[in-house]
Amino acid sequence: MTNNQQQPITIKISEFEGPLDLLLHLIRQNKMDIYDIPIAAITQQYLDYLHSMRALKLDIAGDYLVMAATLMTIKSRFLLPQPEPDEMDEDNEDDDPRDSLVAELLAYKVYQEAAGELREKEQARHQHFTREAMLVPADLSAPKLTAGITLDDLQAAFRQLVAKRRRVRPLTKTVVAETINIDERMTQITTQLQHQPQGLDFADLFTVSASDEMLVTTFMAVLELTKQDQVALQQAEPLSPIHLYLRQDEQHDEH
């Protein structure tokens, strides 16, 4: 006699923290170039994963479905007839539908790097005896980005850098190990700003030859310096270059 009751399925799908985590896993597993993602292949593999989840009657979080729609949209743009070079507008000449996705993936790597560093610091703290934590003052405000500059503005600037990096990077390059962490990069940036009191453009912190690790470490360092009020950001208008300055009190502290 057949037992009609379904047995509960035990499967570890929580290996991935979200759609970007899954995409990064697929890119690494297939040794794909994050700056030149074969969109048809990655879309098919991503959809195959979702189909397998459905086959096992597992719930799929909404953000996974949103990413699936995004991948399909990018794929469809590649299937459309492309304009001839002489018919392209200057503004769209270097537009690649993957740019925004690549920037999101690299930004996600930023948070992975930061989470890894926090875990290491937490483990190191467990090796020491510490006094009881003091209560946080009620009037202590959460760190914010400079007034007028939002996280979206920084991410937009980051996407522009990714697009430029993809266009101008060499086809082959010698890989040089860079082991700098976020704290060290923060020190480098503040030192650079001490020698440039007039400030510098956000884009000038990112060299074309830098590794992906340096790219995300630099981005995270800028976020941290801004949140700590060591660095001020200015932007004349939306999507215009973001300028960094060392705050006056920080400059005086160094003299």
From Swiss-Prot:
Location in the cell: Cytoplasm
Cytoplasm keyword on record: yes
UniProt keyword annotation of Cell division present: yes
Keywords: Cell cycle, Cell division, Chromosome partition, Cytoplasm
GO cellular component: cytoplasm
Similarity comment: Belongs to the ScpA family.
Function according to Swiss-Prot or TrEMBL: Participates in chromosomal partition during cell division. May act via the formation of a condensin-like complex containing Smc and ScpB that pull DNA away from mid-cell into both cell halves.
Name recorded for this polypeptide: Segregation and condensation protein A
Organism: Lactiplantibacillus plantarum (strain ATCC BAA-793 / NCIMB 8826 / WCFS1)
